[in-house]
Amino acid sequence: MRRSQLFLLAAWIFFFLTLCPPTARAGHPEQQADNGAGTFSLQNERVRFTVVVENGRLAADRLEAKPGWSKAEGGASPAAVETDADFGLEVMVTDWSAPGKVNNAENPVVLTKKDFTFIGRELKELPEGRQELDLDFKAKEISIRLRLAYQLGAEAFYVRRSLSVSDLEFGHHFLRWFWTRRGLVSGIGSVLKNGGFGQPAAALLDGGGVFFGVEYPAAENHLDMREGRAEILCGQEYGRLIGADGLTSDWVVEGLTPNSFVKNWFFRYLDEVRAAPLRPFSLYNTWYDLRAPEYPDWPPDKVMSERTALRMVDILRRSMIEKHGLKLDAFVLDDGWDVYESDWVLRGEQWPRGLKPLAEELKKTGTALGLWFGPTGGYSFRMKRVNWMRAHGYEVVGRDKNNARLCLAGTKYGALLKKRVTDFVADDGVGYYKWDGLQFSCSEPGHGHPLDIYSRRAVMESLADMCRAVRRENPSIFLNITSGTWLSPWWVKFANTIWMQGMDYGFADVPSLSRREGAITYRDFILYDDFRQQDFWFPLANLMTHGIIKGRHESVGAAAEPLDKFTDDVLLYFARGVSMYELYISPDILTDGEWTSIAQSMAWARDRFPVLMNSEMTGGNPLKGEAYAYVHFKGTRGIVAARNPVMEPARLEVKLDPAVGLDPGAGGLVLERVYPTCRVWPRLYRAGESVILPLDGFETAVYELYPVQEAARPLLAGATFDVISEQGKDCLVQYYGVEKGAKLLNPEIIESAVMGGKSVNAGALPLPEDEEPSLVTGMAVRPEGAGRPRFTVRFNLSETGREGALALLMMPDPSSAGGPKPSLSARIDGAAAAVKTEPQEGRSQWFTIDVRPGKHEIAVQARPGRDSQEWIGKVAVWLVAKQKQPTKEISFRLKAEPKPGPRPPKVWAVGEIRKNVKLGDISLNY
């Protein structure tokens, strides 16, 4: 048969097939629209969604708020958003010429709504009150069928849309990208968030707002204003042939908000699509305590094994569970449990009976066994694992230690890893995984997956399949997927937590008095970069921030460090709003005070988790030494965890913001500082107001916000206080630091009050203003001659001061910055004194000298650093000490017995505070 005859025959077959209606889905007969036109709707009590088809072509869609819902949520008028409903299919067409193209090789092509004709629709009622509208189309020039599916939940304020394509006739066209939304949006007032890789796009509307995004971590979502028009583009790469079985995109969400709090509504939506509900989850991790025997000079009693693991379980049970009543959700074996030269096989010598004896022992306290996996090969001795896997036929990329890794999308290795993680859940009761180290690209041929950008999807799908597989075995398993992830909010469809970015720990280039202070600042800068500079929309509660670190083999603090500084780190870790409470500790080296700090902080965080789970970072840049805070609001309650990363005192303004979750109508709110000391502000606040929080140098402070009528304890406002005892209805309070206007905010709960042995009126307590005693007097800082590197500091430290230190901050002039740092020596009252320093990578550095109460003269000698002939700069001189304050007492008898909940730890003695007093500045030039 001639080529021309073949072409005519193929054309007649194609024409006949296009006249045939599409096959209806089983159980759902197809419904044909009249004259290729129609208006189709989905609606619930909150929103109405409408799709318009005109002249056989998809025309527009509209999502609008219902007046009742809009009014109930404080919207000025019902919001609405309309799009042209367009989409894009980027296809490599296998044909003589692609639709709309002239030349044979002119490919690929993007098929949009103009390339398809409407042929029918179907409306479905789904479980839980959900509705689905399916619209069917056929391509005008090639044999592709398209289905647009829209879903609306019973109480949803968002509609989801997906694209499905199939080819029952040819099956050789290649789908490059699904652009699930691609077109114009009307009604946009201003763009709040342009979107990006894995990020949602969001905008304000008249009366509310809107957000868009593909429910897939590796998708692209973009919303831009061009020449006064808003354009939306949401899509994902695919890389598959379009065949009879069809290909379906992930859902793209379009959410409508009834007010301007778009981000808050987006997080509400996220709670409805996450794989697992947010919950506190505490764990111990062996990484800084137990490791593999291959580690050089590793102590035999710290080699990971059944024996050493059971010993740690016993210590944790006694120190944490029995003594403090805390729950430990998981005991996690980090790197070291498997044979490095194997396909993830347990070490038989260290675990002769397998993992079941450990898992059974953990069950006695309701603790799950957890395991670490390094999907691409791990870190320690990774080349042993990678080379063994390569030799045994598993897919590997690269050959040297810097780039060699296992391919998670490889046919053989992907199947192996899925089987291993599933078997450990089924056979050993594993209830937690830490999957650490991922790579989302591989262009090695022969691995059984698409190459180039499509390998990203192959790895993502392999990982998602692992997540689904282990959740089928144990729906409550906790999945922590770490290095290699990015802050797309749609990771919560698969994982409980992902990595915050940055290093496990680090030390910020901000002058710090201790390593732990520097580590706190580093961690908070990483989060500042995530949430303030990069503007990632991601729930902080779903981040792994690498928990409390104090191990025998690694610690971010000194072996013997001040308890209050350790507790600052511990409490702030929980108060950021994380849900995974990680203990990277050696349980047998912690002091009783450190255990108490961990236990009380964790108990407080668990109790306050419904509020803490809603987090927003505010304030300045930690790396610039600016004060900052983590704010949490829900309903009428709030928590603010604030910190000042430098010695100079600061004031931080925090808005009581409905946009972050505070009830817009909330009023009569108490502001109480609950750490490091207790103090209630004398006035009541309401939503929308701002509060000014004073922060001393290097202070971490935690505040709670709640309605005054919910307080069950006496609220002594305008004074710092300690509750000494609570027995039944009796409450004894000691107080100091009284300011003008101090009073009891809730006298109505008091039956009687006694001060100085006399009954007093609780509504008019005699609380005269007082002054704090001086910590230091007679201060003087003097140079010893011009241009000489010596100076003298004189002061008298009060007998009420303890743990005093003279703190010297050396700040180089820009001309001296970057060179070797100077060293200091000192003499106190003529005797040589020890000078301690905290090594600092930045420009400035702290030196400290311990001092006792009394009058002192300290001579300080500065010497240039190695190979340095000159140092120009300034020295800030501070006196740091704790001081006991004179206190008074009030005894209260309450009308009802309170039921006090957990509170943050107390790290200072009653009436004691830490003070920083600046003695002066001095310039040095030598």
Describe the residue ranges of each PLM region:
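Beta-strand-rich recognition/accessory modules
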Residues: 33-36, 41-43, 168, 178-180, ...
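Aromatic- and acidic-residue-enriched carbohydrate-binding clefts of CAZyme catalytic domains
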Residues: 277-280, 284, 327-361, 382-412, ...
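Active-site-adjacent "subsite" loops/lids of carbohydrate-active enzymes
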Residues: 284, 288-308, 368-428, 514-515
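An acidic-aromatic substrate-binding cleft motif
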Residues: 258-330, 334-338
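Acidic-aromatic substrate-binding/catalytic surfaces of carbohydrate-active enzymes
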Residues: 37-136, 750-775
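C-terminal beta-sandwich/jelly-roll accessory domains of carbohydrate-active enzymes
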Residues: 615-626, 635-637, 642-805, 811-870, ...
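Active-site-proximal substrate-binding groove within the catalytic cores of carbohydrate-active enzymes
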Residues: 44, 63, 244-250, 463-679, ...
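Acidic, contiguous internal or C-terminal segments within carbohydrate-active enzymes
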Residues: 29, 53, 126-127, 131-186, ...
